[in-house]
């Protein structure tokens, strides 16, 4: 079975997907890490992130490998583990540009669809585009302020600056991030992580 968990930036997708995957005893797949890795490689190479052709050519010459694990995904480029570098502010600022490229999205989608179920997939369009026939779809949301306060606990930045960046990111991601018609929408704002995980696992179809 494939479970999809989509949602806005900093809505808790990765933590929730990891928790649901552990509860089910299956891997979880973070599509966002592939976009972040593509952004990081493009920035390291000095590429114009708005140049889809150059970015795609570079990615094909420097293949990425997603390692899906229940406790947390890792992304490799050759022997280099990119994972520790993927959540910097610089990557945050560039990832929406990269994710907006249709051919880059197709490149990511192909890698995800090549994975063998069962797994929990989290991202922006897992339930709408990548795995539209998944039997269990969820969409996480929360106010920009709540999301900014959560993210401020992970990095030394002012809540106001993070909130402004998230609002901008939401506007850029509107076309990519929308709940599937058959997705269950969960506002994570008033809930603990464990409560969100239970809310999802309690609604899963019988295996």
Curated annotation (Swiss-Prot):
A Gene Ontology term for the protein's cellular component: cytoplasm
Enzyme class of the recorded protein, top EC level: transferase
CDD domains: CMPK
Pfam families in alphabetical order: Cytidylate_kin
GO biological process: pyrimidine nucleotide metabolic process
Catalytic activity annotation: CMP + ATP = CDP + ADP; dCMP + ATP = dCDP + ADP
Subcellular location: Cytoplasm
Binding site for ATP: 7-15
EC number: 2.7.4.25
Keyword annotations from UniProtKB, A to Z: ATP-binding, Cytoplasm, Kinase, Nucleotide-binding, Transferase
InterPro entries linked: Cytidylate_kin (IPR003136), Cytidylate_kinase_dom (IPR011994), P-loop_NTPase (IPR027417)
Principal localisation: cytoplasm
Family: Belongs to the cytidylate kinase family. Type 1 subfamily.
Name the UniProt record assigns to this protein: Cytidylate kinase
Taxonomic source organism: Deinococcus deserti (strain DSM 17065 / CIP 109153 / LMG 22923 / VCD115)
